[in-house]
């Protein structure tokens, strides 16, 4: 009897392991079929014991994977890896509007930022770092609450992002909880360094007007788990995160620098400073300046530099959970290749865009002040990354003004995230900012807190 039970147990373990690894097997088969070197390279990045172990630990904690959620859905027969949506077959696909954002549908038929097709790739199992998982496991289910100002507070009344490193509201029940889970993703790592980020200003004829090259830095100032200084950063008390930008070219704006420090207190505005080299002076900005473009000609504003980065305040914004669903979105394979395949001219996509099926929550952020440039932001939040898979920004007339869609540079062996590419499209005026990023993984250790002092940042130019 003992032998029989042992054999049954071993079979169950093997079955569970096999099921949890199926996403890797799917990628192996897919890469063999396409024969594309970038797909083979992605298989090499995920086909190892370290990835399997980390993916399994996150799956065990969540109680699901992207694949298990998709398995519960009745998906169209065509919607599987290898299928390519084109302008020739899209009209024969009655389901396409249920999964593919309108912006991408239009790319198949429009002369503005056109593409040849959208290839479905296998769904990947994403996760964050093990240390973030461990910190989250330590929390009690009711550890956090949201107060009357919309602040995240722990059970002792302290600011949640200051006192804890774990993720809040893993199973969000409403829009406010989902918004804080999204905020907790941050940038998916303790430190971020772009060297460089290229921001191309593109017109309606798909021509490049200007390209800005810059460094972007970001640092989690509290709840650090994976890179020194661990915990909270001395000298930045009350601050949850900091971002900095330094433009390197073109020459007329070289040296433009911005630093933004985010306080946990909803009543304390961001410490937001901008150095303007042509004037040789530093300006103190306010939260409303976050609506301004980062540089002339760009659709990218300070509030959208990581899809959505304005401050949470339930007195100014309403956060509403709309639905759960499935969306086609770019895979986070940027550590190996760019699934958008941005052309060398910086303003076009070179042909076939890769997308995968992702389970998401959709929530809306509604402006209550009637003074913000967007009346609503619609955010599709991934159920594994807890970050935006797609974002729509609605103008004061109720029409879509801009969309944000990006691809991440995700490191499978560690669960760390940075970025690879992004499109910020002004669908109203047919302009776009197309971004390519070189995530400087090898330079993270060189980052210091001095970067987040505007006087010292400007001297780096």
Question: Where are the regions that the model predicts?
Answer:
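Bacterial N-terminal signal peptides
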Residues: 3-13
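Sec/Tat signal peptide C-region and signal peptidase I cleavage site
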Residues: 13-19
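Solvent-exposed N-terminal domain segments of exported/luminal and surface proteins
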Residues: 21-269
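Extended beta-strand-rich segments in extracellular/periplasmic secretory proteins, especially
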Residues: 129, 134, 141-142, 150, ...
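Flexible, processing/modification-adjacent segments and terminal tails
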Residues: 161-202, 264-268, 276-358, 450-461
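Cysteine/selenocysteine-centered motifs that mediate thiol-based redox chemistry or coordinate metal-sulfur cofactors
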Residues: 321-327, 347-348, 415-461
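C-terminal soluble interaction/assembly domains
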Residues: 366-441
């Amino acid at each position: 009897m003992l032998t029989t039970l042992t054999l049954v147990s071993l079979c169950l373990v093997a079955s569970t392991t096999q099921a949890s690894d199926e996403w890797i097997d799917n990628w192996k088969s897919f890469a063999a079929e396409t024969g594309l070197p970038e797909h083979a390279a992605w298989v090499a990045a995920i086909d190892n014991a370290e990835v399997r172990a980390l993916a399994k630990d996150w799956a065990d904690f969540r109680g699901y994977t992207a694949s298990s959620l998709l398995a519960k859905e009745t998906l169209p027969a065509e919607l599987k890896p290898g299928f390519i949506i084109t302008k020739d077959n899209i009209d024969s696909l009655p389901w396409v509007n249920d999964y593919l954002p309108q912006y991408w549908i239009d790319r198949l038929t429009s002369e503005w930022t056109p593409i040849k097709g959208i290839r479905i790739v296998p769904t990947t199992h994403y996760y964050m770092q093990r240390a973030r998982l461990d910190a989250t496991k330590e929390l009690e289910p009711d550890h956090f609450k949201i107060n009357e100002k919309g602040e995240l507070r722990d059970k002792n009344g302290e600011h949640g992002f200051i006192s804890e490193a774990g993720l809040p509201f893993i199973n969000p029940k409403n829009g406010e909880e989902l918004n804080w889970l999204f905020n907790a993703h941050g940038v998916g790592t303790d430190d971020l360094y772009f060297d460089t980020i290229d921001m191309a200003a593109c017109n309606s004829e798909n021509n490049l007007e200007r390209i800005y090259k810059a460094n972007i830095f970001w640092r989690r100032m509290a709840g650090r788990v994976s890179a020194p200084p661990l915990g909270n950063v001395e000298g930045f008390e009350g601050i949850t995160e900091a971002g900095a930008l330094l433009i390197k070219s073109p020459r007329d704006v070289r040296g433009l620098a911005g630093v933004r420090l985010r306080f946990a207190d909803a009543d304390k505005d961001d410490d937001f400073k901008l150095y303007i080299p042509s004037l040789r002076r530093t300006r103190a900005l306010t939260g409303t300046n976050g609506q301004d473009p980062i540089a002339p000609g760009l659709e990218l504003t300070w509030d959208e530099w990581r899809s959505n980065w304005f401050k949470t305040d339930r007195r100014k914004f309403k956060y509403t959970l709309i639905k759960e669903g499935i969306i086609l979105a770019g895979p986070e394979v940027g550590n190996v290749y760019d699934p958008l395949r941005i052309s060398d001219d910086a303003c076009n996509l070179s042909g076939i865009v890769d997308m995968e099926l992702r389970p998401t929550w959709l929530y809306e952020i509604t402006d209550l002040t009637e003074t913000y440039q967007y009346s609503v932001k619609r955010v599709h939040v991934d159920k594994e990354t807890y970050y935006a898979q797609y974002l729509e920004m609605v103008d004061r007339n109720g029409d879509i003004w801009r969309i944000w869609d990006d691809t991440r540079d995700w490191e499978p062996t560690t669960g760390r995230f940075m970025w690879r590419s992004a499109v910020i499209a002004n669908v109203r005026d047919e302009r776009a900012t197309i971004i390519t990023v070189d995530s400087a993984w090898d330079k993270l250790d060189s980052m210091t807190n001095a970067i987040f002092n505007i006087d010292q940042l400007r001297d780096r130019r």
